[in-house]
């Protein structure tokens, strides 16, 4: 029980700005087991967003609430995944060789491609969530971040790391397939309860497809994955899920 709590808190501490202030075991096995809780952390974040939406929907227009929810997410996560998307785009669109791309991705400064990617990412999230709320799919506020994290877990089933060292290496190739498939089954079952089978499976397949395409792009550009590409995967998975759900 103590190890389970350790791994759960480790995921919160690693992926959010929520102050845990505890000395936790941070071995590779803890991250491997803790992967089960990554969608749970996303559920907590999405759940808090949904409660904010419910609390404000009678006082503010839906479009204003969505902006506040995106701001809230950025504050809670520290913009971790959005930063990964920006760094990935800066590197990949630089059209340089592998070593230079990785060097660009490690640069803390954001470039023009990263800026464009962030603007498009935020605009799409805003418009898609706003449109889905108006369509009666407010539960997408909760589901989208969960699907994004599930996409990360599937990407991490690969063992191809682009760097010898990096924060992403504690996840890449360090996933248990039974854990990934088990938590995915639970999430899909819950999503089916709220959205129905068709509106769950098709957007989810779309998210997995974009994850696989990103994986192929990573192999082509840097011969593997990094922590930044995992963040990019989360953002692309969320956007794809929301986009296809809106089309249903």
UniProtKB/Swiss-Prot annotation:
<keyword id="KW-0808">Transferase</keyword>
<dbReference type="GO" id="GO:0008818">
    <property type="term" value="F:cobalamin 5'-phosphate synthase activity"/>
</dbReference>
<dbReference type="InterPro" id="IPR003805">
    <property type="entry name" value="CobS"/>
</dbReference>
<comment type="function">
    <text>Joins adenosylcobinamide-GDP and alpha-ribazole to generate adenosylcobalamin (Ado-cobalamin). Also synthesizes adenosylcobalamin 5'-phosphate from adenosylcobinamide-GDP and alpha-ribazole 5'-phosphate.</text>
</comment>
<dbReference type="GO" id="GO:0005886">
    <property type="term" value="C:plasma membrane"/>
</dbReference>
<keyword id="KW-1003">Cell membrane</keyword>
<keyword id="KW-0472">Membrane</keyword>
<keyword id="KW-0169">Cobalamin biosynthesis</keyword>
<dbReference type="GO" id="GO:0009236">
    <property type="term" value="P:cobalamin biosynthetic process"/>
</dbReference>
<protein>
    <recommendedName>
        <fullName>Adenosylcobinamide-GDP ribazoletransferase</fullName>
        <ecNumber>2.7.8.26</ecNumber>
    </recommendedName>
</protein>
<comment type="pathway">
    <text>Cofactor biosynthesis; adenosylcobalamin biosynthesis; adenosylcobalamin from cob(II)yrinate a,c-diamide: step 7/7.</text>
</comment>
<dbReference type="Pfam" id="PF02654">
    <property type="entry name" value="CobS"/>
</dbReference>
<keyword id="KW-1133">Transmembrane helix</keyword>
<feature type="transmembrane region" description="Helical">
    <location>
        <begin position="36"/>
        <end position="56"/>
    </location>
</feature>
<keyword id="KW-0460">Magnesium</keyword>
<feature type="transmembrane region" description="Helical">
    <location>
        <begin position="199"/>
        <end position="219"/>
    </location>
</feature>
<feature type="transmembrane region" description="Helical">
    <location>
        <begin position="170"/>
        <end position="190"/>
    </location>
</feature>
<feature type="transmembrane region" description="Helical">
    <location>
        <begin position="137"/>
        <end position="157"/>
    </location>
</feature>
<dbReference type="GO" id="GO:0051073">
    <property type="term" value="F:adenosylcobinamide-GDP ribazoletransferase activity"/>
</dbReference>
<feature type="transmembrane region" description="Helical">
    <location>
        <begin position="114"/>
        <end position="134"/>
    </location>
</feature>
<keyword id="KW-0812">Transmembrane</keyword>
<comment type="similarity">
    <text>Belongs to the CobS family.</text>
</comment>
<feature type="transmembrane region" description="Helical">
    <location>
        <begin position="59"/>
        <end position="79"/>
    </location>
</feature>
């Amino acid at each position: 029980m103590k190890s389970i709590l350790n791994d759960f808190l480790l995921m919160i501490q690693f992926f959010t700005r929520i102050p845990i202030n505890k000395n936790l075991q941070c071995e590779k096995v803890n991250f491997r087991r803790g992967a089960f809780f990554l969608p749970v952390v996303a559920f907590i974040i999405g759940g808090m967003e949904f409660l904010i939406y419910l609390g404000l929907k009678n006082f503010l227009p839906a479009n204003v609430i969505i902006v506040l929810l995106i701001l809230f997410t950025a504050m809670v996560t520290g913009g971790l995944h959005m930063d990964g998307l920006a760094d990935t785009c800066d590197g990949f669109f630089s059209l340089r060789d592998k070593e230079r791309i990785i060097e660009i991705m490690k640069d803390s400064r954001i470039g023009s491609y990263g800026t464009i990617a962030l603007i498009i990412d935020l605009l799409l999230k805003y418009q898609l969530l706003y449109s889905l709320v108006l369509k009666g799919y407010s539960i997408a506020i909760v589901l989208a971040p969960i699907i994004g994290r599930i996409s990360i877990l599937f990407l991490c089933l690969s063992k191809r790391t682009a760097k010898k060292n990096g924060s992403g290496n504690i996840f890449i190739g360090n996933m248990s397939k039974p854990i990934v498939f088990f938590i995915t089954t639970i999430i899909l079952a819950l999503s089916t309860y709220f959205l129905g089978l068709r509106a769950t499976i098709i957007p989810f397949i779309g998210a997995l497809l974009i994850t696989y395409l990103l994986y192929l792009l990573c192999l082509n550009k840097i011969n593997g994955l990094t922590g930044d590409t995992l963040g990019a995967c989360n953002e692309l998975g969320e956007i794809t899920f929301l986009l296809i759900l809106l089309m249903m």
